[in-house]
Amino acid sequence: MVTAIVAILVLVVLFAVIVAIAKDPGPQPEDVAVAYEVAWDKLDFESLYTLAGSELRDGLDRHQFIVAKKAAYAEQRALSGLADRVGVDDSATAGNAAIVATRVELHDGGVVCNRVDLARRNGRWEVVGYRLAPTDAGGPPPGS
């Protein structure tokens, strides 16, 4: 009798854990966009590949992508570690699409604003577009 009760309790707990995991939405578009910016700042090509959709992987598999990016940036180490702070200025989500306007504050006092386009695929957000956004002189970033 006690064994049956313990077995039922274990099954109930297991079911509750599975439901909780299934309902977890994972990182939100804003989190993924900030992680993508930070990965670029660190020239962390492994993370960039993981966060990017096929649109930004240059048709390469993971290994090829990382090797190609490391080769392309081998002499550009000065481009890493420039960000002092990365944040989100604005975001909009509609269904399985999102646009996030990021703001990268640089150590030298400069600011770079980017537009990060994301798509929700297989239960997770992927970066599918990434471009420089207009700054103060050009008006608000697209999608804001």
Task: Give the role of each language-model region.
Residues 58-71:
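Short, charge-rich amphipathic alpha-helical segments embedded
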Residues 25-28, 37-41, 57-61, 92, ...:
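Extracytoplasmic/periplasmic, Sec-exported soluble proteins
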Residues 43-58:
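Short, well-ordered alpha-helical segments enriched in acidic and aromatic residues
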Residues 1-42:
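Short, low-complexity N-terminal intrinsically disordered segments enriched in polar/charged residues
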Residues 86-144:
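Exposed beta-sheet edge and beta->alpha loop/turn motif
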Residues 36, 48, 65, 118:
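Hydrophobic pocket/interface hotspot
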Residues 68-97:
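A short, amphipathic edge element
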